[in-house]
Amino acid sequence: MEGSALIGRRTLTLGTALAALTLGACGGTAQDAKEPSGTFEVSVVESKFPQKQHISQAEQLVIAVKNTGNKTVPDLAVTVDSFAAKSEQPELADPSRAVWVVDTSPAGGDTAYVNTWALGPLKAGKTRRFVWKVTAVKPGTHTVKWRVAAGLNGKAQARSGGDQVPQGQFTVDVSDKPSQSRVDPATGEIVRSN
């Protein structure tokens, strides 16, 4: 009996030590450890999204950003906060409801963040375009807010025109009537009429 109690204590001590080692290995370096600190000058040279849309109609949202500074932007990113809206129904497990469905997002820009896309470093004088193809699924008037960042973790700050955060918004009216479309027999292209 005494021997099995001793084995039990050793097993418990060994298990505790292994658990401590395992938890200690989870830490690692901070997520933003490799992101440089600083301010990076950029300019939004294009931002467009149709003001009048129809439900079930695919449209493009475009934001193009130029590095107007003299140093490389570490990881050019754009956050779009308004592809979904909060439902007022109190008993929903997830109150987020789509306003637009993202059909395609900027190529190679997916991140771990739900509403942020990053296209990597941007050298001085260069421009990068973020293009989303989205389809409206909720009629009404909606505001789409966006902002540009120089990195994903907050240490690299994008600025435009001095100390301004490069950001903007679109006000969009989505009609509850789907747009009419047909196939042009001569070209095979889809022709939409509103």
Regions found by a protein language model. Name each.
Residues 2-14:
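Bacterial N-terminal signal peptides that target proteins for export
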Residues 66-72, 83-85, 137-139:
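Short solvent-exposed strand-capping/beta-turn motif centered on an Asx-Ser/Thr pair
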